[in-house]
Amino acid sequence: MKLPVSSPFEDYVKPLPAGDRAALADFFSGFDSHCILAKAEKRKLREDFEKVILYYVNLNLSLGRALELLDPANLGGFYARPAVLWFPLDDAAKIYPLSMKPGSMSVFRLSVYLKEPVVPELLQMALDFTIRRFPSFATTLKKGFFWHYLDTAKRRFTVSRESDIPCRPLKVSQSGSPAFRVLYWDRRISVEFFHVLTDGTGGMVFLKALTEEYLRLKGIDACVDKGPWALGETPSPEEFENAFARIEQSSSSSGFVERAALQMSGRLSENRPCRVLHFRMDAAGLHEAAKKYRATVTVYLLALMFMAGKAATDQMKGEQSIQVPVNMRKFYPSKTVRNFSLYCGIRLPIEKIGDMEAMTGEISRQLESKGSKEAMNRMLTGTERLVNSLRFVPLAVKQPAARLIYGFLGDKIFTNTLSNMGVVQLPDRMAKEIEAMDFVLGTAISNRASCSLVTVNNTAMFSIAKLTADPSFEEKLYELLKRDGVEVKVEGSELYES
């Protein structure tokens, strides 16, 4: 007969003085009052607390201080109430589940690089505490008769050690499966989101809140509970609204049909992405390079991408087109962490790609025109009219047609993408703990490169998610940056090829 084996936490508790055991009993009584999860999920959540208590004890932190940092009140009422909320998809999100195919899903990734290795137990605890502040993320994707929707999932959301290709599809078809994942590797914390949940702005709010909570558990005051997304605040409806619905329709609408754009010529990989590269640059140096052409950083990088794209294609005629997301919050201030972005396409004939002064001028003109409030309103009106026309079409009929339309319109009309998150603002004490950030877009169906940029602490990280092993695009981009005096440190993965 096998005797039951005690856990490391039970071994720790047995020799404690009666006062400490009583304090732990009171602590876990408080935990019980904050958690009504199913038995298995509750056990996992309790074990998260036990592991962090042991971590603190091994650091010679007093039990009293450990229990103070881990106060079950940080769970709020999230785990103590049954699931009742559900969220209709916002206007931009509705296409994403319709267009899913095996191995293909609109996923993006945000990462923060700390100055010390990540402690997995603390990151898991930080997620346990943070998720209650983001009820629209604590959901699972479900099918309605006409549309998909997000249904609240009361569960313990899991942190995992990174072991796979970035931006792999999430298994949202499984019951209760989340539409995001939290990963760690060495000093990096990453969150990957299915675009049905949020856009880059909303994702960054979540990553910052998660990182702040992680640092608090590390004993670092990173200004938690002092901003609008303090974990102790009660979520408000405007933080999870479909902000598109507040915008009045334009008198005219813009269509979605564009001419097919030139594609880079490298052979498509079976792995999506087949490689992720990061160009780490001094943000001030990058800004100075752009100023030489009287351009913004976005315009400057778009010009370089057009030149690199020309070097990566065998086509001699036609147009390149780069998709540029447009954050609607700059036109309509909103607290929402759901999708509130549209896009425009910057197009240049391949024969006019070459002269930087001419290109930056034309790109600036197109960005100002196509990315304007009026142009975005026309696109939104067109989107809403399309959505309304499909409103009462059963989901089973909509999905096959949407896959076909998305595959043609969403991919063939662009050569690649540039999404610039801009400069991320952090509290000073938090910024001191962070070395850099990165932002990675999942690959499209046939676009060979998806590019993104995020800047923090004067470090600009330009990321390229590749869909071909052909290195022509990134090699030309590197050459052009060096030509303009920008120091570039290339980081990233090897080829994910068998």
Protein language model annotation of sequence segments:
Residues 1-148, 154-180, 310-498:
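Acyl-thioester-dependent acyl-group transfer interface
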Residues 2, 11, 42-63, 188, ...:
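Non-catalytic, low-complexity flexible loops and terminal extensions
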Residues 114, 192-193:
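A secondary-structure boundary/capping signal
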Residues 119, 199-203, 297-298:
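Hydrophobic (often cysteine-bearing) scaffold residues that line and stabilize catalytic clefts
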Residues 188-190, 461:
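General beta-strand recognition
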Residues 195, 290-298:
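Alpha-helical hinge/cap motifs
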Residues 297-306:
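Short amphipathic alpha-helical segments
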